[in-house]
Amino acid sequence: MPDSRKARRIADPGLQPERTSLAWFRTMLGYGALMALAIKHNWHQAGMLFWISIGILAIVALILWHYTRNRNLMDVTNSDFSQFHVVRDKFLISLAVLSLAILFAVTHIHQLIVFIERVA
């Protein structure tokens, strides 16, 4: 069994590299679609905090794109999972997804409050 990930992929590619690549690409597309929806539905009532969060989310989307692009270029060693930049990228991806979910939750809760006030 070859030691490097790239050599193993060349020796027996299987479907795992393709599935992983497609999963990251699907994550990036879904993330982009959610960002577009956030801008579409909230631009009219957006304050400075909204635009700052959209800017941060766009930066993290670029990091996600960079991370998925570099997955095919790197060889994985045992220390790669403890290196700072790898852990940072994964943390920022998770943080971006969480913050986008919170943004949508707050927006929907606000809409529910407005609806309940109109009904009452």
UniProtKB/Swiss-Prot annotation:
Residues 40-48, 114-120 are periplasmic. It is found in: Cell inner membrane. Keywords: Cell inner membrane, Cell membrane, Membrane, Transmembrane, Transmembrane helix. The chain crosses the membrane at residues 22-39, 49-68, 91-113. Residues 1-21, 69-90 are cytoplasmic. It comes from the Bacteria. It comes from Escherichia coli (strain K12). The keyword Nuclease does not apply. The lineage of its organism: Bacteria, Pseudomonadati, Pseudomonadota, Gammaproteobacteria, Enterobacterales. It is a multi-pass membrane protein. This is Inner membrane protein YidG. Signal peptide: none annotated. Its main location: membrane. GO terms for cellular component: plasma membrane.
